[in-house]
Amino acid sequence: MEISMTSHINNAVETFRLEIETLEKLKNSIDENFEKACEIILENNRDKSRVIITGMGKSGHIGKKMAATFASTGTPAFFVHPGEAGHGDFGMITKNDVLIAISNSGTSSEIMGLLPMIKHLDIPIIAITSNPKSILARNSNVTLNLHVDKEACPLNLAPTSSTTATLVLGDALAIALLKAKNFSEKDFAFSHPNGALGRKLILKVENIMRKGNEIPIVKPTDNIRKAILEISDKGVGNTLVAENNTLLGIFTDGDLRRMFEAESFNSQRAISEVMTKNPKSISKEEMAITALEKMEKYEITSLAVVDNGHNILGIVTMHDLIKLELR
């Protein structure tokens, strides 16, 4: 039987409509139980507890995402599969933790099987379910009712509206906790060290600068030929000029090109005669993004890294910073 494109679109729109209705109903039902759930988590977090999230099937998939969102927004959390918990993983849960148990029906046999041990630990249980009279709800400290009467699935079988509601409720909890803890952009960066924001807010110059034998350095009495060899060897595009490791100047490949264009080029001249004195530098404690901004401002491709006495500690290059994708 041929199905028209219009039918596909109508089915999609109907799915959106049903799930949006579910979310509207959930939004309008948020009450003091949501407040209690947040307070339970915040109170236990003061004792460095974790939020343990469990759920079976599609609820479990949503639970994994919920745990990941909690963990990345300042609430330590991880997912425990209820089936595996019954075969050893229950040992991951401690008496200081808080459990969020997800079951739309509130009767998941795997979660029911864990209730005696959870009660034995005497840890707070937050139930997420559409059945406030279920065994799970009756054994919980607080129940967050999803209020899902019908799935978007026309068979009313595949978890659709219920999983969407659970996902959004989890996000609502995470954001409420984030705001309660005054979780900042910098805090977020620490939990995302490999992301662009993390690198921007965490990486310092000392973390990415070239050190030791990687630093191109010549003495002021060395000739231009020696400087050219140093530039070629270190591949930075310039060489620092230093006396007893104190920064005096810099000689770049741009300086070299301009000298070649002059009629009186002499590779035996002392580098001190042609170097740029008092070059731009930066402290190792500065942020990497600051080094990038400084290079862009002065239209240069590297910065000497020095201490308060102008002693050379390293060199940071535009090329290295671009590879970090700080923006």
Swiss-Prot record:
What does the activity regulation annotation say?
Answer: Inhibited by hydroxamates, mimicking the putative enediol reaction intermediate. Most potent inhibition, with an IC(50) of 0.7 uM, is obtained with the 4 carbon-based hydroxamate containing acetyl moieties.
Residues annotated as site: Catalytically relevant: K58, E110, E151, H192
Query: Which is an annotated Pfam family here?
Result: SIS
Q: Which UniProt keywords apply?
A: Carbohydrate metabolism, CBS domain, Isomerase, Lipopolysaccharide biosynthesis, Metal-binding, Repeat, Zinc
Instruction: Establish whether keyword Isomerase is in the entry.
Output: yes
Q: Catalytic activity, per the record?
A: D-arabinose 5-phosphate = D-ribulose 5-phosphate
Q: What is its EC number?
A: 5.3.1.13
GO molecular function terms listed in the Swiss-Prot or TrEMBL record: arabinose-5-phosphate isomerase activity; carbohydrate derivative binding; metal ion binding
Q: Which pathway, metabolic or otherwise, does it act in?
A: Carbohydrate biosynthesis; 3-deoxy-D-manno-octulosonate biosynthesis; 3-deoxy-D-manno-octulosonate from D-ribulose 5-phosphate: step 1/3; Bacterial outer membrane biogenesis; lipopolysaccharide biosynthesis
Top-tier EC class? isomerase
The signal peptide stretch is none
- What are the CBS domain coordinates in residue numbering? 209-268, 275-327
Q: Where does Zn(2+) bind?
A: H81
Superkingdom of the source species: Bacteria
**Quick one: a GO biological-process term for this protein?**
lipopolysaccharide biosynthetic process
Q: Which family does it belong to?
A: Belongs to the SIS family. GutQ/KpsF subfamily.
Q: What is this protein's function per UniProt?
A: Involved in the biosynthesis of 3-deoxy-D-manno-octulosonate (KDO), a unique 8-carbon sugar component of lipopolysaccharides (LPSs). Catalyzes the reversible aldol-ketol isomerization between D-ribulose 5-phosphate (Ru5P) and D-arabinose 5-phosphate (A5P).
Kindly give the NCBIfam families that the UniProt entry links to this protein. Answer: kpsF
What quaternary structure, including any partners, is listed in this protein's UniProt entry? Answer: Homotetramer.
Name of the molecule in the record? Arabinose 5-phosphate isomerase KdsD
